[in-house]
A protein has these predicted regions:
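Acidic (Asp/Glu-rich) sequence patches and key acidic residues
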Residues: 1-110, 116-117
Length: 117
C-alpha cells in the first residue's frame, strides 16, 4: 500500500470508430471476464484486473490478453466465444481486435484499459 495518491497523466482513450457493436458488447465482456490464463505457478489468473459496476471501463492483463489471442489462434476458444460468433463476428475478427488492443495500447503498463461508450 502506498502513502500518497498520484494521478496518471499519459493514459488517454483513443476516440475513433471503436470495436464491436452494441449487440456484441455483453458477449465480449463475458468472454474477457471468464477467461483465465496460466500464472506460471501452476494456478490460473483472471484476464480482467478491474471492471467498474456498469462494465464500461475494464483493465485487462496484457499477458492474459496475449494468452487469449494464442488460444483463439490455436483453436482452443473458450465456450464464451460462441456468443460473440453468434453476434456476427468471426474468430479472426476477435484475434484482429485483440491484437490491435495489444499493439496500440500503452506498453509501459502491464494492463490494457478499454472503455465502452
Amino acid at each position: 500500500m502506498g502513502y500518497r495518491a498520484h494521478v496518471c497523466t499519459t493514459y488517454r482513450v483513443q476516440y475513433g470508430t471503436g470495436c464491436f457493436s452494441a449487440g456484441a458488447c455483453d458477449a465480449v465482456n463475458r468472454l474477457l471476464e471468464n477467461y483465465e490464463y496460466p500464472d506460471g505457478d501452476g494456478g490460473r489468473k483472471s484476464l480482467v484486473e478491474y471492471c467498474d459496476a456498469e462494465e464500461t471501463v475494464m483493465e485487462l492483463s496484457r499477458e492474459g490478453l496475449g494468452s487469449l489471442v494464442a488460444s483463439l489462434e490455436n483453436g482452443e476458444a473458450p465456450e464464451e466465444t460462441d456468443a460473440v460468433l453468434d453476434a456476427g463476428y468471426t474468430r479472426e475478427d476477435l484475434i484482429s481486435v485483440f491484437r490491435e488492443w495489444l499493439d496500440s495500447s500503452d506498453k509501459s503498463h502491464g494492463f490494457i484499459r478499454i472503455e465502452w461508450f
